[in-house]
Amino acid sequence: MAADGTLSRGGVGEAVEEEHPGALEPGAAPFGNFPHYSRFHPPEQRLRLLPPELLRQLFPPEGPEKRPILGLDVGCNSGDLSVALYKHFLSPRDGETCSGASRELRILCCDIDPVLVERAERDCPFPEALTFITLDIMDQESRKVPLSSFLSQFGRSVFDMVFCMSVTMWIHLNHGDRGLCEFLAHVSSLCSYLLVEPQPWKCYRAAARRLRKLGLHSFDHFRSLAIRGDMAKQIVRILTQDHGMELACCFGNTSWDRSLLLFRAKHTHETQAIPESSTKETRTD
């Protein structure tokens, strides 16, 4: 995620900066929009925690006309994870064609970095299903039209699922406690289900330390943040206590120690039990 005006998913950089300090471009760290993020944290690490049938079970077909499942991927970077999620959730089942599966899911993928978005558009193997746009999700004015325009194409007012994968830290560092809370309030208002991969606090410290080593300014809000410590629990608290969400499932932790948390809007009707992850990792800390 690009943290400056907002997000760009490279939000992955914090862990990379600790493990591969020479691999990141110096100017990228403050925004999180690392150009080769998937080389260090491949999509497969997240996918192994997410049941392939998750979307099918959460959103079963209604009637003979199957309306598409609508997703929003916030901080999509160069689209590697967006494409991987699409293929993972819609891999054809026995007797099902690829073309039939591809009509079931449409994802709007946004990032603040136009260079990464251009790369995502150029390399996307599913242009009919994945739409990439340059967007500052923290800009309350500029985000309205593209989000509502996408939804209106399908006669919808909210997304079925919003994906926030390793973006919360960059929002928090660049916009402070208030910005993080505003971001969570906004994305939770946009969907029935919200999948969040929060960065742990150690990644905040690593991001600030890396900037100091490079001789760059530190994040303005870092030392004044009151929301700190166990960030997964903090985000659960904010979403459940303040924004009408409930924690539906924790799918476990990635190998770089980030939990995948699925939230459900309380007004959402639970039609199916959430399938269990294929792994046995269940920690939320």
From Swiss-Prot:
Binding site for S-adenosyl-L-methionine: R46, N77, D111, D136, I137, M165
Annotated EC: 2.1.1.-
GO annotation terms (biological process): negative regulation of pre-miRNA processing; pre-miRNA processing; tRNA methylation
Compartment annotation: Cytoplasm
PROSITE patterns per record: BIN3_SAM
Annotated ranges, domain Bin3-type SAM: 53-275
Gene Ontology MF, one: tRNA methyltransferase activity
Family matches, as SUPFAM superfamilies: S-adenosyl-L-methionine-dependent methyltransferases
GO annotation, cellular component aspect: cytoplasm; cytosol; nucleoplasm; plasma membrane
Catalytic activity: a 5'-end 5'-phospho-ribonucleoside-RNA + S-adenosyl-L-methionine = a 5'-end (5'-methylphospho)-ribonucleoside-RNA + S-adenosyl-L-homocysteine; a 5'-end 5'-phospho-ribonucleoside-RNA + 2 S-adenosyl-L-methionine = a 5'-end (5'-bismethylphospho)-ribonucleoside-RNA + 2 S-adenosyl-L-homocysteine
Top enzyme class: transferase
Key words, A-Z: Cytoplasm, Methyltransferase, S-adenosyl-L-methionine, Transferase
Chain's role: O-methyltransferase that specifically monomethylates 5'-monophosphate of cytoplasmic histidyl tRNA (tRNA(His)), acting as a capping enzyme by protecting tRNA(His) from cleavage by DICER1. Also able, with less efficiently, to methylate the 5' monophosphate of a subset of pre-miRNAs, acting as a negative regulator of miRNA processing. The 5' monophosphate of pre-miRNAs is recognized by DICER1 and is required for pre-miRNAs processing: methylation at this position reduces the processing of pre-miRNAs by DICER1.
Record text on subunit structure and interactions: Interacts with DICER1; the interaction may be mediated by RNA.
Family: Belongs to the methyltransferase superfamily.
Name of this chain's protein: RNA 5'-monophosphate methyltransferase
Encoding gene (name): Bcdin3d
